[in-house]
């Protein structure tokens, strides 16, 4: 079963996709946010095209593990994604995924302008791989 990860932001949605076995995460794309209705329709079409069985949404927690405004927005968005796609939505702790993605892209020699374009989908990929590893019993989780 393929899993789609969404790293939600106010300007962009980072997207990552698992392989068909649900083992390996790979970057998919970055969706520039428009209206909520357009975003949900785009996600619905992606779910159908890639035969997604599960969706994982990054849940931004504070370093102390608390849920604040951004996390509540992510949960509200997740409920709408679940309704629009008909697929179950899980939430996964996304603390430090953007920092790790940025470091990875710097290590790869990506210029700042290119990093801005890629960091959201790389963060979604790290988020998804953490979720997949946890589901397989291989890693710590959220």
Which ranges hold each PLM region?
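Phosphate- and other anionic-substrate recognition elements at nucleic-acid/protein interfaces
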Residues: 1-6, 10-142
